[in-house]
Amino acid sequence: MNPPFAKVSWATVTLLLLLLLLPPAVLSPGAAAQPLPDCCRQKTCSCRLYELLHGAGNHAAGILTLGKRRPGPPGLQGRLQRLLQASGNHAAGILTMGRRAGAEPAPRLCPGRRCLAAAASSVAPGGRSGI
């Protein structure tokens, strides 16, 4: 027979530890007087947790959603970063990224196999396409 505490999830244990350890650290008299670390001022390290604890706002919501957030620069730079880090054909994705930025896909004039037949019949005798 398993004891009742054997099925406690990792998230529950983490939350309990945060609730037990953070209030004394945050409410201590020296906590508010601590200066911002050099690495946070220079933006050379990840200081998201430090900013959550010492900044204004709902700290509990920020801490609970910290692991769920996916940071990434918006726009083309973020998409380029995701393309480079993902598996697959990087060259094809990067080469077509500019075209996909604001352009809508071109409408297909004819559905299915008829498009292939129309394209094949429009090729000029010199090998150039008449389309």
Curated annotation (Swiss-Prot):
The keyword Endoplasmic reticulum applies. Belongs to the orexin family. This is Hypocretin neuropeptide precursor. Residues 98-131 form a propeptide. Neuropeptides that play a significant role in the regulation of food intake and sleep-wakefulness, possibly by coordinating the complex behavioral and physiologic responses of these complementary homeostatic functions. A broader role in the homeostatic regulation of energy metabolism, autonomic function, hormonal balance and the regulation of body fluids, is also suggested. The modification Pyrrolidone carboxylic acid is found at residue 34. The gene is HCRT. The modification Methionine amide is found at residue 97.
